[in-house]
Amino acid sequence: MKILKNCILLIIFGLLSTQLINADTDYCSLLENALMFYKMNRAGRLPDNDIPWRGNSALNDASPNSAKDANGDGNLSGGYFDAGDGVKFGLPMAYSMTMLGWSFIEYESNIAQCGLTSLYLDTIKYGTDWLIAAHTADNEFAGQVGDGNVDHSWWGPPEDMTMARPTYMLTTEAPGTEIAMEAASALAAASIAFKSSNPTYAATCLAHAKTLHNFGYTYRGVYSDSITNAQAFYNSWSGYKDDLVWGSIWLYKATQDSDYLTKAVADYASGGVGGMAQGNSHDWDNKAPGCCLLLSKLVPTTSTYKTDFEGWLNYWLPGGGVTYTPGGLAWIRQWGPARYAATAAFLGSLAGTEKGTDFTQKQVDYLIGNNPNQQSFVVGMGPNYPINPHHRAAHHSTTNDINNPVNNLYLLKGALVGGPGSNDEYTDDRTDYISNEVATDYNAGFVGALASLVNPSSTSVPTTTPTVTETPTETPTETPTETPTETPTETPTETPTETPTETPTETPTETPTETPTETPTETPTETPTETPTETPTETVTPTPTVTPTETPSSGESLSIYKSGLKNDFQDWSWGEHSLTDTTNVESGETNSISFTPKAYGAVFLGCFECIDTDTYNNIEFDINGGSSGAQLLRITVVKNSKSVGSKLITDLNGGTPIEANSWTKIKASFIDDFKVSGKVDGIWIQDIKGDTQSTVYISNIIATA
């Protein structure tokens, strides 16, 4: 009985503690600092000195005709750097501005209550100004500035960048429906946000939004097929079906022109967008959940949208399908889980239900430190907050070294880091980009969730209910590419430079920062333990709902790749590779992996805790050096989202270089060679030279007893 009484007292204390923390939380201060993070990521000629340690940067960024702005700087010099790097990726930047615009529209009164209206609108405008500048002609848009591989191979503040920064354009011949529609969405949302305070600017935003919508809708194509440099960082995993709907919804909201809504309704049905939302995150790649939510409000007479949104939200609630950490974070994937939970929390706040509001409250509480470890995931705020996020400017190395100085020189206050592992484990380690990268899209959903909690009893702005014609007034010019129901989200945003330290993600030199920002089902992720200084920024790993393609054979071996991925393993690589190469195939196989080592890229095949090294003692694979051989590569084992052991392939081959035009079997012991035990998440094979090497081929990757 005494034990029972103590348990009851502990439960009551826990509930009271939560209530007190909620009551005492200054959401206005959190919101202000979350917005100030964007000032820390500004590029171009800065209009103020609000962040004294940031200066002018990327002043020569321009469209291919070297156009200048009013200050004589490149016309694309402004905008936001994506994450902890110096690249301007058009898709996540536009997505971030759409999300900020959306939260402003929904929670304008809460924002005003905090006295943050001016800061909020300034934050949006700094991004939308760049989107307008990037829209250089009716059917032309600058989708990216900066070479991700080159940028990620250097570690230092953006003010010191000297590398070439190419601009990648989208045109009618090189279309990019995702970016065109996302930029249209951002500018349409901005036109609503600025309508009362700056009607002239609002009109400019809307004019560009209409033209961009027409560009994306008429000239269809996957943007990362046109801007191939983006594939290792922000590949379009979901295709553009969701973007067609998303863009049309926002144009309808801004114009009340029913033609846009008719398109949205038709494309939602034909593209299977409701299905794309289920079991997934709302993020820069997949806007399907947001489409369900907005259409449920715009077309309340059609139950499909409400049903689809409720299905999505229920998945995120306890017991609904998404993994929950022991401390209570809704954890959908290992790359930057905090960002997904924060964005889901924002959408939950708009559900108009008690369970949605409760979900929002609990997720934000966890992120700001109300969790068993009393660990905040917001830099500079809450208990035990991070101080070493993966961010070049805040770290401020002058020696191209991710480890020097030991601690970041400047506090990136208000930035949401990637977040914990599935068991709430977390280490404040700059080189661990999976847990410690920050990015504009990470904060975008977080800002919205915070704005909702300033006054949780406030309701979002109601939307007009239109009359919808079920048949589109314009038939799509092309059937959008197919989208998986599960979409990876991102790939690295950065690549290490050269001096490795430990778990680089992309280009060694130091320790990588983060190769993808997320780990896609197909590209991104992490980087070596040795050279890289950083890896890509956003590789997203897809929601783990894949059906295994092969069952391991009675404990003797576990196939990872055999003419294709096996047993739930996914492609989280960053770098130039193919999983379906047929030009150099081992006898008895139909495909091999081709990999062109350069810029510290890697082939990363992962599956969370799928290899139990107590059962499978070794990792084996066959490798062919192709036309030249002698490639300098390293194999790294990943556990709990971190590299835990690494060996040069040459060393595993008895000191013999990789042989040209011949298949060689490589075998390594998890315990003896990598000093690792327990369950691990996979392996990556990475370039350690930096310069481009000849293509290598890999086959038959298995874990053996």
Swiss-Prot record:
Instruction: List the EC numbers from the record.
Output: 3.2.1.4
Q: Where is the active site?
A: 85 (nucleophile), 390, 428, 437
GO CC term, one of those recorded: extracellular region
Give GO terms: molecular function aspect only.
cellulase activity; cellulose binding
Question: Which reactions is this enzyme annotated as catalysing?
Answer: Endohydrolysis of (1->4)-beta-D-glucosidic linkages in cellulose, lichenin and cereal beta-D-glucans
- So which domain of life are we looking at? Eukaryota
Renumbered residue ranges of the record's region Pro/Thr repeats ('hinge') (Pro/Thr box): 463-552
- Which InterPro entries would you find in this protein's record? 6-hairpin_glycosidase_sf, 6hp_glycosidase-like_sf, Glyco_hydro_9, Glyco_hydro_9_Asp/Glu_AS, Glyco_hydro_9_His_AS
- Identify this protein by name: Endoglucanase
Q: Which organism is it from?
A: Dictyostelium discoideum
Task: Give the taxonomic lineage as stored in the record.
Answer: Eukaryota, Amoebozoa, Evosea, Eumycetozoa, Dictyostelia
